[in-house]
Amino acid sequence: MKPLKILISNDDGVFAEGIRTLATSAASRGHKVTVVCPDQERSATGHGLTLHSPIRAEKADELFGGGIKAWGCSGTPADCVKLALNELLDQKPDLILSGINHGPNLGTDIFCSGTVAAALEGTLDGIPSIAVSVASFQWKNFSFAGKLSLDIAEKAIQQNWPKNLLLNLNIPPCEEKEMGDLVWTRLSIRQYEEQFIRRVDPRGNTYFWMAGEAVKDLQSAGEGPKGWPSDVSQIALCSPSLTPIQPDLFWRGNLDDLPNLI
C-alpha cells in the first residue's frame, strides 16, 4: 500500500514509551508520521478542552528521530488533535492513532479517557481513527501492540471505513505467543467502589486523593451483537479486544420507556 499520512497523539505525554513505540512502528513501514501530544501526563482528562489559557506547542523531533515530526503541547489530548488538524499539519492525515496508552481503556472507562478523546476528535472530523491501549500500567513491552495497531490500521484503511466509526483496541499484558485471537467485543459497564483518601497539608488545609477500584463489570452497555464477548472478559482471557464505538450517544432503548415529560 502507498504510505499513509498518520497523526499520532496520546494522553501519557511526549516522553511516554508507548507513543514512541507506535510512532517508530508506523515510520518503519514507510508512513509519514507526525506526533502532536501533551507535553506532560494528561491521563483521565476525557474530552476536556483548554479555553481559559493559551496552548503552547514546542517542537520535539529529537525525542523520536527517524524523520518523525513531533510537537509537545501544553493542552489536553483533544486540544492536541484540534491544534494539529487546524494549525500544525500541512495536509489532512489519512489516519489518526492515539496511544499506545499505558493502561487499559475498557468499558465505560472510555468516557474518562484522554486516549479515546484524542482519537474521537479524528472521528468527528471524518478521519479514520484508532485508540490503542496496553491493559496494564506495569507492562513496558509495547512492540507487539505497535505491530498489531498498524496491521489493523493498514487493513482497515484499505476497506470502506464507515462514517463515525472509532476503533478501540486493547491488548493484554502478556507475550505474543501466549495471546489468544483478536476478536470484536462489546463495551462493558464498569462499576467502581469509589474511595477518597483525606489528608491534611502542613498548613492545616484538608485535601483528597481519589482512589477506588472496579468491583463489577456488567456484560455490555446498550444494544449490540449478543454473541460478542465484553472487552473486559476478552482481556481477562489474555486476548486482544477490538471494540467499534461511535460519538452518537443517543439512547437506543425502547422509546416507550422514556419518562412522560413532554
From Swiss-Prot:
It is found in: Cytoplasm. Its cofactor is a divalent metal cation. The keyword Metal-binding applies. A divalent metal cation binds at residues 11-12, 43, 101. GO terms for molecular function: 3'-nucleotidase activity; 5'-nucleotidase activity; exopolyphosphatase activity; metal ion binding; nucleotide binding. It catalyses: a ribonucleoside 5'-phosphate + H2O = a ribonucleoside + phosphate. Disulfide bonds: none annotated. One of its GO terms (cellular component) is cytoplasm. Pfam families: SurE. InterPro entries: SurE (IPR030048), SurE-like_Pase/nucleotidase (IPR002828), SurE-like_sf (IPR036523). The keyword Hydrolase applies. Its EC number is 3.1.3.5. Keywords: Cytoplasm, Hydrolase, Metal-binding, Nucleotide-binding. Binds 1 divalent metal cation per subunit. Nucleotidase that shows phosphatase activity on nucleoside 5'-monophosphates. Belongs to the SurE nucleotidase family. This is 5'-nucleotidase SurE. The lineage of its organism: Bacteria, Bacillati, Cyanobacteriota, Cyanophyceae, Synechococcales.
